Amino acid sequence: MRFCWISILLIICTSASALVPIDKPNLREETGIAPAYFGPNAFPVPDMLDGRVQNHLRVEVAGDGYFGYQGDITTDVLARVHVPLFTDRVNLTIWMPVMEWYEMTPERMTTCRVPDSLAGRGHGAGDVYFSTDIQILRDRKWAPDIALRAACKSASGGQYELARHYDCPGYFMDLSLGKSWYLGNEAMRRKGDEARGVELRVAGSAGFLCWQTDNGRQNDAVMYGLQMLVKSQYVSFRTTWSGYVGWENMGDRPMIIKGRLSGHTKGFEPYVEYQYGIKDYPFHMARVGLAYHIDILKKK
């Protein structure tokens, strides 16, 4: 457990100050530093845990295409890695959009308050995210899996003046619960992909998310999410409804729904994913990715 608390402290303490002036902040004044007025990688709705943490070393690379409701287009390359911290109950996750390429329409630039004098197309690196994921409880006959996650994002993403990234730190913490039922072979619970059977899983999550805005202020939000999973030996489908609710109520309440179809074979997981922004996240997203995992803890 010592590694758990050390990792949490490192995450909470690894934050930088936003490059904004501090001058008598007016808490009633809306900032507009919110998902509705920035690029899709500014502070998207975090991927939801399903009550379980990764107990394998998992490396993932994906390509994303974001198609804005106002005609703007963003493509990026996403990288993610999960590293178990000497136990199958705790892992460190690091992810980032390594590079994005974007083209904004004049309409979108007006919505985001980008000056006409700036070019609405270009490329740039994104923010880096870190999280510690902790398995608090494993499911029993009637009890669900419970996982706690503490995460922060860097202020490394640039092009604030082009409304691509916030240029400020942020963090979130959430608790997820999930329960599975098995059809065909109860042994699938222990043997994973090696067993024949179907897993049906339902999960929910709730948490707190925060990011610094301007003038020394921050926006606090409540996170939420529901998820369903159907998984067989070689294929799985997962659908998620999630979002967060900021206190300013000015473009800071993104809500999305997405579905992912994955294959499973010999440690590889190719997948395709589609995401639709329901509110305050004006983008369709299509993703194609490949993940590979290795049992470095030799638990099997």
Feature annotation, model-predicted:
Residues 1-34, 297-300:
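Cleavable N-terminal export/targeting peptides
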Residues 19-154, 161, 169-184, 235, ...:
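Transmembrane beta-barrel domains of Gram-negative outer membranes and organellar outer membranes
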Residues 63-69, 96-102, 136, 150-156, ...:
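Transmembrane beta-strands of outer-membrane beta-barrel pores
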Residues 72-77, 105-111, 157-165, 187-190, ...:
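Outer-membrane beta-barrel translocator domains and adjoining extracellular loop/strand segments
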Residues 88-92, 139-143, 183-187, 200-202, ...:
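Repeated loop/turn-to-beta-strand initiation elements of outer-membrane beta-barrel proteins
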Residues 114-117, 215-218, 222-300:
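Outer membrane beta-barrel transmembrane domains
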Residues 166-246:
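Detector for outer-membrane/organellar transmembrane beta-barrel domains
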